[in-house]
Amino acid sequence: MIENALILGAYLFCIGFYGLITSRNMIRALMCLELIFNAVNINFVTFSNYFDTQERKGEIFSISVIAIAAAEAAIGLSIILIIYRNRKSTRIDQFNLLKW
């Protein structure tokens, strides 16, 4: 059981990491980042159930990561919306907002 959950977590992490590196769209990159967070949450819960069955530290930490990821997604989508309104594009390679 633990092997299947860890393989699923590693598979989701690799898909998210590959998508984050190769993505040229900001929304797709944000979705891949959320996929990475979910893979990490699966590993937290799996290791918590395997090593410490009495205390639920992994589940509590996983819930806090979900809350932080939801806030990150809301802020990220609002920033993407503002950039889209100004530049009419969400492609990452077209932006040089940090350059003078």
Swiss-Prot record:
Its main location: plastid. Belongs to the complex I subunit 4L family. GO terms for biological process: ATP synthesis coupled electron transport; photosynthesis, light reaction. It comes from the Eukaryota. NDH is composed of at least 16 different subunits, 5 of which are encoded in the nucleus. It catalyses: a plastoquinone + NADH + (n+1) H(+)(in) = a plastoquinol + NAD(+) + n H(+)(out); a plastoquinone + NADPH + (n+1) H(+)(in) = a plastoquinol + NADP(+) + n H(+)(out). One of its GO terms (cellular component) is NADH dehydrogenase complex. One of its GO terms (molecular function) is quinone binding. It is a multi-pass membrane protein. NDH shuttles electrons from NAD(P)H:plastoquinone, via FMN and iron-sulfur (Fe-S) centers, to quinones in the photosynthetic chain and possibly in a chloroplast respiratory chain. The immediate electron acceptor for the enzyme in this species is believed to be plastoquinone. Couples the redox reaction to proton translocation, and thus conserves the redox energy in a proton gradient. It is found in: Plastid, Chloroplast thylakoid membrane. It comes from Angiopteris evecta (Mule's foot fern). This is NAD(P)H-quinone oxidoreductase subunit 4L, chloroplastic. The chain crosses the membrane at residues 1-21, 29-49, 63-83. Keywords: Chloroplast, Membrane, NAD, NADP, Plastid, Plastoquinone, Quinone, Thylakoid, Translocase, Transmembrane, Transmembrane helix, Transport. HAMAP family: NDH1_NuoK. NCBIfam families: PRK05715.1-2, PRK05715.1-4. Its EC number is 7.1.1.-.
